[in-house]
A protein has these predicted regions:
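C-terminal helical subdomain
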Residues: 119-120, 137-179
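Substrate-binding pocket helix/loop in short-chain dehydrogenase/reductase
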Residues: 36-37, 44-46
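Conserved NAD(P)H cofactor-binding loop of Rossmann-fold oxidoreductase domains
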Residues: 28-34
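Active-site helix of classical SDR
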Residues: 60, 95
């Protein structure tokens, strides 16, 4: 399902909600375009906003009653750029800041129903996210994260006992090194 197609997304979620017991929603889709902000085009900005912020908010809204009933969890994959300057990626960083801010407020709204809201903020990981950038992660292993390391952080947060919520985890490699492609 194209998560930027709101009508199709809502129809798909209704089917899932009808046929499955939903206890965890993972908002993991993401897209990034990098470069000077003045050089981005409106379509790229719109795609980032719709994918990184709007779709997770709509998915969460569509499933929130079910998650409240099931005392479920919303798990958001944000980015370290949510809380720091991100030159050559300011629109991407803004969408992730929006997602992280949404998660903080949502937790305060739904915690009394037993719903957990968790945000993982990974730094540069060895994924295809940077395929559109003129840079990539450093060559040495300590300069990037592996996707499974981000998954381990999520698993840690999800494994906590009932009544304890790890609301935010930031995961960074030891070194901050990038290189030009």
């Amino acid at each position: 399902c194209d998560i930027t197609d709101t009508q199709a997304l809502c129809a798909h979620i209704k089917e899932i909600d009808k046929n499955y017991r939903v206890t965890v929603l993972v908002n993991n889709a993401g897209v990034g375009y990098y470069g000077l902000h003045e050089e981005l085009n409106p379509k790229k900005i719109q795609k980032m906003v719709r994918t990184n912020l709007e779709a997770p908010m709509i998915l969460t809204q569509q499933l929130l009653r079910t998650l409240k009933k099931n005392r479920g969890t919303v798990l958001n994959i944000s980015s370290v750029t949510a809380a720091q300057s991100n030159p050559h990626g300011c629109a991407y960083g803004a969408t992730k800041a929006g997602l992280s801010g949404f998660a903080k407020s949502l937790f305060d709204e739904v915690r009394k129903y037993g719903v957990r809201v968790i945000t993982i903020q990974p730094d540069m990981a060895k994924t295809d996210l940077y395929r559109n950038a003129d840079f990539c992660e450093g060559e040495e292993e300590a300069s990037y994260l592996l996707p499974e390391e981000v998954a381990e952080a999520a698993a840690f947060a999800l494994a906590q006992r009932e009544g304890l919520v790890v609301t935010e985890i930031t995961v960074k490699p030891q070194f901050h090194r990038i290189r030009r492609k």
